[in-house]
């Protein structure tokens, strides 16, 4: 009996028209059937936001053998949720890949990123997931290294799987990488986050800007990416601080 083909779901937070998702999907096609379900426009910084008070729409944009494209009016996580409940209702995809994001999602960016947020939804749905981000914010940029590494890691995931509550976040430097390194996420934060300005009527407005710094001691994904390496960080869905949990229990006992 002929085995079912591999099914790959692809999403992002830059929108279905973005260069990154188009080139990623094309690179993944030799691995199996590829289905894009992505926002109908940019949704950067959407994190794990969902739409709960408005209806969302799913629109078929393109279909050919082994390759289908849908746009969704919701957030990146909406896209994955809706895909699981419609397109993949009868059979879950074998792999979820998000990106390629135009801009890195290293360090503290993981909690803000729609690209990572969409991949985390894969953990919720028990689907192995990989988020791919390139350290280049240009609308048109060289995606060749990012897509090549994405395919390499996707093959590894399809062969070996991932823990049920863990996804992988990949950050690719601009230019030719020195190699691939597994690492922790940098314990960072943003400084100088907003630039003050005025609108046409003289009212104060603020533009998001800023830069990320390492507030910890671990050399993580941000530093290694800046040093020229492709970084690969395992991220858990369950955010419980298990190290602090027994401490909390003891403190509560004392406070009674």
Curated annotation (Swiss-Prot):
EC number(s) from the headed UniProt entry: 3.1.3.5
Organism: Porphyromonas gingivalis (strain ATCC BAA-308 / W83)
Any one GO cellular component localisation term in the record: cytoplasm
Gene Ontology MF terms: 3'-nucleotidase activity; 5'-nucleotidase activity; exopolyphosphatase activity; metal ion binding; nucleotide binding
N-terminal signal peptide: none
Job description of the protein: Nucleotidase that shows phosphatase activity on nucleoside 5'-monophosphates.
Disulfide bonds: none
UniProt-recorded name of the protein: 5'-nucleotidase SurE
Substrates-to-products reaction catalysed: a ribonucleoside 5'-phosphate + H2O = a ribonucleoside + phosphate
Enzyme class: hydrolase
Keywords of the record: Cytoplasm, Hydrolase, Metal-binding, Nucleotide-binding
Cofactor(s) needed for function: a divalent metal cation
InterPro entries: SurE, SurE-like_Pase/nucleotidase, SurE-like_sf
Compartments it resides in: Cytoplasm
Hydrolase found in the keyword field: yes
Cofactor detail note: Binds 1 divalent metal cation per subunit.
Chief place of localization: cytoplasm
Residues annotated for a divalent metal cation binding in this entry: 13-14, 44, 101
Family: Belongs to the SurE nucleotidase family.
Pfam hit, one: SurE
Record lineage: Bacteria, Pseudomonadati, Bacteroidota, Bacteroidia, Bacteroidales
